[in-house]
Amino acid sequence: MLKKDRKAGYYGSLQAGANTKGGANSSFNINYNSKLLDAYANIGYRHRKNTGYTESTQTSNTYDQRYKADNDRWGNNLFTRAGLTFHASKKDDLSLSGMLMKGKGKSKSFTPYEYTAVADGLTDYRMDRLTRSSNDMNMFYSEFNYRHSFTDRHFLDFTVDYSRWKSDGDNFYRDSTVWEGNDVHAYDYQYRPQHINNRRWEVKLDYENQITKDMKVEAGYQANFSHENTPQESYIDNTSWEGTAATEDKLFYNRFIYDMDLHALYASFNYKLGNFGVMAGLRGEYWKVNTESYTWEQEHDPSLREKPFKKDFFQLFPSLFMSYQLTESQQLQLNYTRRLRRPWGGQLNSFRDTRDATTVSFGNPELTPEYSHSFSLNYLKTWRDHSLLVSAYYRPTTDVIQRISYKNSEDGLFYSTSMNVAKSQSSGLELTLKNKFFRILDLTTSANAYYYKLDGFAYPIDGQMVTGAADDRFTWNARMTQASYCPTTYPYRLPDATRHAR
């Protein structure tokens, strides 16, 4: 934070750069500050260009494959940022800031595949594949902040921000195959537009009070409101290279709508008594999820749509951090936290994707978050030029989200989805040693031993029981990093690592 009694004035900078591949960048920024007002503005431009070439030869007992691929990519991005802070009084600040990004990118790849028959009864053939894509990206972010400072160590902070990400892309895939001795071409044309439209609101209210040198309290409220609406489309043509007779692939179509609202309250208390320090906290979260998934028929006929899938949750997340200063250079730490990992939107989409002829993939709207308890015990020892940190940790997890695959007993097809299937346990020991020698050499050595166990499970799905065997593994690794300093040169690093797993 800038001091409020500084002298008023302007300052700014301008820079530009380029590289040998045809890329370029430039930026300009200006700042103004005074006792009453602070302001800044920035604009930047970046141009990317990349040309690549790939060549490969592969052999098998049926065909030998050879190809030479040409790849071209370029993109332009424009970035702008601006902000304003008004010092309404010695204790009150109001800020408004925002950021915009507008970008466009294109790529092209042409790959001629040549297949030479090795086995009897097969014919040589050639397949040309052309892939083109273009993408328009727009990002917007804005933030309002108000802070009231009772004292330097006692304040109330309120923030509201809004962000939006919108992307419109076009992807074209063209295949042309011709067999030796036959001039008739087989075509496979696909056009897949991609439209992403996400937005999010966040509201935060934070209170902090350093009551004494050894005592501090914090409390706050946070709310997030996110919305995602992403359709999936495809147009196909098997009669021409240009796709002049392309029709919509109705089986591929899907619109997925995902909304999540979250409200959280938290409080924490920090206290130090002699050599003993403690921080205890509690966070309560309530959130609700709403998902909708439409096929092509449901998109065009609302009467066919199923009811949106809705679910809400309330959970408490305690935390406790304790430390004890054994001596001036030795400290013990004991920590505990309860955590969660939520499923991401795509894992909740019930649409059955049949693009892969061997496996039907789909999401599971019934998924719940994973919950884990994390325990750690740390010992820290410091010397003037050296330090040693030894950490032991243990983390049991419930409702583990696992990707499972199974063969349906009715239609004989393979399916893949995500389920909350079992419990897991993670434990380990980590050692970190830092050494400084003669002011010119820094060494960091770390070693980690890690054990993971996943319980077996039996889960009913599609009228049958899907089972999974218990699994466990032990892994260890060690790493050393060196940083050397010379009087007239920059530091350089030489990493070395060893890894082993069972």
Question: What would you call each of these model-derived segments?
Answer:
Residues K68, R200-E202, T247-Y253, F362-N364, ...:
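Outer membrane beta-barrel strand-and-loop segments of large Gram-negative receptors
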Residues V217-T327, Y459:
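Signature of Gram-negative outer-membrane beta-barrel scaffolds
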Residues Y450-K453, T498-R502:
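Short, catalytically relevant binding-site loops at active-site mouths
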Residues T239, E370-H373:
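Outer membrane beta-barrel transmembrane domains
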Residues M1-T116, R129-D168, D206-E228, S268-N270, ...:
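Membrane-proximal, glycine/serine-rich, low-complexity loop/turn segments characteristic
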Residues T51-R66, E114-M127, R174-Y189, H227-R255, ...:
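Surface-exposed loop/turn segments flanking beta-strands in extracellular/periplasmic regions
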Residues S109, N171-S176:
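Small-side-chain secondary-structure face that scaffolds active or pore-lining regions
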Residues A8, N19-G22, K68-N76, L130-N138, ...:
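Short sequence motifs at beta-strands and strand-loop junctions characteristic
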